Amino acid sequence: MSLNIETKKVAVEEISAAIANAQTLVVAEYRGISVSSMTELRANARKEGVYLRVLKNTLARRAVQGTSFAELADQMVGPLVYAASEDAVAAAKVLHQFAKKDDKIVVKAGSYNGEVMNAAQVAELASIPSREELLSKLLFVMQAPVSGFARGLAALAEKKAGEEAA
């Protein structure tokens, strides 16, 4: 499908805007994937707040020029789907988890903090809990001593009330 120059410029601007605030950009090959699988992948990405797009590699290379993802341009070969997210692990997690279900999605590379990652490093990044999960775990750890102290005080109050009644 041939795109005219204005359509290409609009696409590059849209992609540049989408990745401007992204911490992570992950690319995966999608050769031979069914429409229903791609629709499911897009739905998963939307749910996790991941910008997911299939586009020409030349347009993607232009969009990443001058960004922290510029080093990833060498990896942009073949039919690729691009996933970008503000959450450092969301894009990697969405593509990695979907690749486990559908072998037609193959994670090729990614970029985080200006560093290019291979597929194994993207898988490692995907295994890290999200920011929300880490915050909830931290909150639980911080609440545990306080709630234990409160339960101890309540038990002591019950014991004192039981002794006074007897």
Curated annotation (Swiss-Prot):
GO terms for cellular component: cytosolic large ribosomal subunit. It comes from the Bacteria. Keywords: Ribonucleoprotein, Ribosomal protein, RNA-binding, rRNA-binding. It holds the Pfam family Ribosomal_L10. The keyword Ribonucleoprotein applies. GO terms for molecular function: large ribosomal subunit rRNA binding; structural constituent of ribosome. The keyword Ribosomal protein applies. Gene3D superfamilies: 3.30.70.1730, 6.10.250.290. Part of the ribosomal stalk of the 50S ribosomal subunit. The N-terminus interacts with L11 and the large rRNA to form the base of the stalk. The C-terminus forms an elongated spine to which L12 dimers bind in a sequential fashion forming a multimeric L10(L12)X complex. Belongs to the universal ribosomal protein uL10 family. This is Large ribosomal subunit protein uL10. It comes from Neisseria meningitidis serogroup B (strain ATCC BAA-335 / MC58). The gene is rplJ.
